[in-house]
């Protein structure tokens, strides 16, 4: 697959603009709520540390009064483009969300445009490469009850290359996702998600159909006295792999 298609392969699995690890159907939960934060929080710093590496990634987030992200600044020590800045613009009348991500030298890395339907579900998503102008489009079709969706991804020529079937809980969080790669014409992988009573992801299982193996992810969460998430630990196949810390900025 081309680089942008490679990016979208992972994008479909985290397509709904949150910092969580799961597809989110409608915006019944705001970006702030998905992160486990209360309504009073306006700015946070996220620190992600991989256990087997000294380098860590730091992300600064700003929210509007509705809990939607308006700005994201990423200091990524583990990648070539170390500083990325994303601006989010909302048009409530047109039901759209525009996100533009820039590199540290000011050049546009990519642009994401999401369009919502009358029920506030993501209906169409377009990802444009800022350098090559290559475009990927994902269209979502929902069941009558909104608990299932089929997402189809096409390239700039209109050729279908990926299909994702997603099942949701009443909160709009994915509980199951099946991905099919058109080129192989085969079921590629299935992912299952489990949440706690707060809506936080606590378990994720990735089943790779081709390789016939399962990768297990377990998530533990710690909260402060105000109810804001302050730490998340991610275990992969039983071993602690990532520690994510949240610091509230005044």
Protein language model features and the residues they cover:
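C-terminal motif of bacterial Sec signal peptides marking the signal peptidase cleavage site
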Residues: 15-18
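Buried hydrophobic residues that stabilize the cores of well-folded domains
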Residues: 20-250
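Bacterial N-terminal signal peptides that target proteins for export
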Residues: 1-8
């Amino acid at each position: 697959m081309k680089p942008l298609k490679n990016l979208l392969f992972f994008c479909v699995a985290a397509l709904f603009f949150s910092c969580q690890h799961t597809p989110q159907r409608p915006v019944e939960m705001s970006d702030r709520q998905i992160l486990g934060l209360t309504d009073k929080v306006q700015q946070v710093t996220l620190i992600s540390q991989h256990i087997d590496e000294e380098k860590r990634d730091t992300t600064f987030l700003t929210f509007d009064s509705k809990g939607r992200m308006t700005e994201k600044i990423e200091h990524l020590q583990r990648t070539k483009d170390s500083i990325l800045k994303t601006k989010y613009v909302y048009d409530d009348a047109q039901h759209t969300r525009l996100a533009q991500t820039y590199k540290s030298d000011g050049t546009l890395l990519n642009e994401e445009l999401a369009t919502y339907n009358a029920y506030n579900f993501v209906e169409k998503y377009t990802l444009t490469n800022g350098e090559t102008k290559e475009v990927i489009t994902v269209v979502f079709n929902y069941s009558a009850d909104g608990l299932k969706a089929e997402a189809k991804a096409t390239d700039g020529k209109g050729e279908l290359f990926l299909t994702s079937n997603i099942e949701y809980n009443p909160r709009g969080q994915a509980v199951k996702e099946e991905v099919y790669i058109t080129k192989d014409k085969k079921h590629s992988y299935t992912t299952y998600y489990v949440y706690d009573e707060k809506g936080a992801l606590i378990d994720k299982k990735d089943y790779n159909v081709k390789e016939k193996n399962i990768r297990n992810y377990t998530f533990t969460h710690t909260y402060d006295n105000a109810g804001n998430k302050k730490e998340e630990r991610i275990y992969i196949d039983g071993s602690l792999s990532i520690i994510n810390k949240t610091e509230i900025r005044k």
